[in-house]
Amino acid sequence: MAVNFDGNIYTCDEGRMLANMGDEIFRLGSVDNTYRELMLSPAAHAVCTASCVEALPICCECVYSPYCSVCPMVTYGLEGDLLHRDEREYKCVIAKGILTHIFSVIHRNNQEEMEILRRWANV
């Protein structure tokens, strides 16, 4: 969440910046609202729904969905809608590329590569 100087509260800082350009789609409420009111706001409901990859038609069949996430703000900026619909969207392509590489490293089971991966993952 991000609080603007005027007391309005948004789902994220990018949503706050978008509001400064006149679009308040990500506004949860204001500092005058209770936490419960903010969490039950239409914006909170919409963002939570749009963030659930298991419910998105383009994502629910994707092999990477358990390891992935979507950002409704990015989707809204690129597609004009909160719901992710394009598997060619840059964040999706990048995530698939990274995950494909990580799974390839795991599959090869090269000890040197696995040690680098373990250090990177901090395990």
Region spans (language model):
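Short, acidic, Ser/Thr-enriched surface-loop or helix-capping motifs
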Residues: 3-4
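C-terminal accessory region of radical SAM enzymes
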Residues: 15-63
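Radical SAM enzyme core and accessory elements
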Residues: 20, 30, 54-123
